[in-house]
Amino acid sequence: MTAETRILELRAELDQHNYRYYVLDEPSVPDAEYDRLFNELKALEAEHPHLVTPDSPTQRVGGAALAAFSQVRHEVPMLSLGNAFEEADLREFGRRVVEGLDQPGAVDYSCEPKLDGLAVSLLYRDGQLVQGATRGDGTTGEDISANVRTVRNIPLKLQGKGWPAVLEVRGEVYMSKAGFDRLNAAQAEAGGKTFANPRNAAAGSLRQLDSKITASRPLEFCCYGVGQLSESIGDSHIGILEQLKAWGLPISRELKHAAGIEECLAYYRDIGERRNSLPYEIDGVVFKVNSLAAQRELGFRAREPRWAIAHKFPAMEELTEVLDVEFQVGRTGAVTPVARLKPVKVAGVTVSNATLHNMDEIARLGLRIGDTVIIRRAGDVIPQVMQVVLERRPQDARPVEVPSECPVCGSQVERTQLVKRSKGKETTSEGAVYRCVGRLACGAQLKQAIIHYVSRRAMDIDGLGEKSVEQLVDEGLIGSPADLYKLQFEQVVGLEGFAEVSTQKLLDAIEASKRPSLARFIYALGIPDVGEETAKVLARSLGSLARVQQALPQVLTYLPDIGLEVAYEIHNFFEDEHNQKVIQQLLDSGMQLQDEGELAAEFAASTTLAGMIAKLDIASVGPTGAEKLVAKLDSLDKIIAADGIDLRQALAAKQADAVREFFKDEANQKLARDIEAQLLAFGMHWSSEKKVAEGLPLAGQTWVLTGTLERMSRDIAKDKLESLGAKVAGSVSGKTHCVVAGPGAGSKLAKAAELGVKVLDEDAFVTFLAEQGIAV
């Protein structure tokens, strides 16, 4: 292929990508792929300058404006920046700057994160916002004035005084990670389009023809410079940004000075380490020579300034090929598809696998084996397939099919059924998840179940990592969690990683695990959708394993943060004969649950007959209607037996008819009586004079743990505080009741002193626990 042919190909491909990105709001390749194509074209044109044409993508920035918006000409072009991908690139930039300025000493730079959003221009005349425009092709953009006026942190009128008659502010409109998550959740619930990432969401939201849609989106603005000015407003980049801030315009909180390129590199590394904890997406750091005089001296080249550069982070998105789709089996039997990829480097790490979640996700993506896809990796998150590049689909691409048999144990694979319950009715539909029915007879499920059971936040059996568990299962030594308590010294010693001392330590740890808290034991069972916090709610509210096992789904919904779907997962788990057998085996092994007791006083005190009626989900009867009904008819028997006249004395006609219709159904009568019987058996009393109960001693209080505790772990301390009703927070505020400070306590202790919050050292904390009847 000749250079001219390749140049024409690259221009055509880049033009198509620009059109998809800027006009259709449908990016077709990751930024890293675009950069590679652009740099290849740039290099070829440098080798063959006679082939450079005015319409080449290297001679302009971006793509054409949408015809639906009126066009705006930028008096000062909105140029893009050159890129540095390696430290060597940044050092070379610094060398060129020093050489161009020919000045002694370190050059002063401004440093700020490169937000991943949409570049915009805001024009203020006499302090009033009169125009907003996109970058467009750098010379001509789109008039989005109505839309930028809806972005809440863009001032419609500047604050203070002294601003020039004409002030053009430039910056980035973006969407925070939290805002993006909220938007996608709302879009999914409404059956609308969801977005691949915050950048696409911001661009798509800002370029809506209907500004009401833009106003509903969680957009934010951050300024990074100025364009046309009727008069100077500063002699340095940072000085200008600080002045803009004084006039009410938001600037980056991460804006800093750097003396020389080495300090720039230190800033880049620091931001890189904190990148995933920032509330917004960034794709690099921008460095600018701070002095405006120095900027003027350095000047510009074709499409970028010589005094600024964007130091990009390793790409979070890349293109690669799906070589195959395999299926893995998890702890609950879920058969999950995993994409096997042609290895590619993403965010500095070589990626060869990516999660596909379930078959609904594969259908949503339209994925086939052999497709070229965009994958994304952010921080420690498992790489995900974001999009299929349909233009690159080969003719022999194959559909993904779910195996009919478990790839591990050969048991049947079944599709889950989703049961929706509303207004007393049930509807069933197919779920997105497929499950192996093999339970603990399936090696994959057994291993994952044991790994979860022994984990630190579950039974906390030290010395049993994933490899050790896999070895014990593969050797046939354990076939269920209860088999851990049957292990003998002679069976373990000599296995890989187990000498005599380590074997004895393991057996001691297993023996010590026989005295767990109820919450830890529930969590260790691996009930679907029951995490650590839900396990604590179950233990704290119901007080005993027997009550948790017996609880009806409707009763479980009375507990904090447990909805009906999760309640059915819990109920179905304990109804299952296989699970009952496993639990009984564990109890028979000598398990002694430490904190079993009575029903939580606040739970018993807060559960009323009216509350029970409201939870029955009778059409049009909410909490207020239920209260009125119980005020007139003070028992369930009376409510069930009531005729239309009695009911209409308590409720509006529509509600009364709904109650009567509901209880005509004998199944509903039985359900209501079963719920009441269980609540009464658990210790509830409908008579208010019998319902006086004392709350937990720390109910309503917020405590904070800081430093290293020597007599117990922080997790154990947290469990003990929560058992007394306290909320354990991660930071100190004016609402904090007490701080427990061990050795090494730092900023939290200082904050407590500043706010006058009570502080206990570990000895005082242990004494306090003893006073509450809690041993350490």
UniProtKB/Swiss-Prot annotation:
One of its GO terms (molecular function) is DNA ligase (NAD+) activity. The keyword NAD applies. Its cofactor is Mg(2+); Mn(2+). PROSITE patterns: BRCT, DNA_LIGASE_N1, DNA_LIGASE_N2. SMART domains: BRCT, HhH1, LIGANc. CDD domains: BRCT_DNA_ligase_like, LIGANc. Zn(2+) binds at C406, C409, C436, C442. It catalyses: NAD(+) + (deoxyribonucleotide)n-3'-hydroxyl + 5'-phospho-(deoxyribonucleotide)m = (deoxyribonucleotide)n+m + AMP + beta-nicotinamide D-nucleotide. It holds the Pfam family DNA_ligase_OB. GO terms for cellular component: cytosol. The keyword NAD applies. NAD(+) binds at D31, A32, E33, Y34, D35, S80, L81, E112, R135, E172, K288, K312. GO terms for biological process: DNA repair; DNA replication. The active site is at K114 (n6-amp-lysine intermediate). Its EC number is 6.5.1.2. Keywords: DNA damage, DNA repair, DNA replication, Ligase, Magnesium, Manganese, Metal-binding, NAD, Zinc. Residues 693-776 form the BRCT domain. It comes from the Bacteria. DNA ligase that catalyzes the formation of phosphodiester linkages between 5'-phosphoryl and 3'-hydroxyl groups in double-stranded DNA using NAD as a coenzyme and as the energy source for the reaction. It is essential for DNA replication and repair of damaged DNA. Belongs to the NAD-dependent DNA ligase family. LigA subfamily. NCBIfam families: dnlj, PRK07956.1. This is DNA ligase. The gene is ligA.
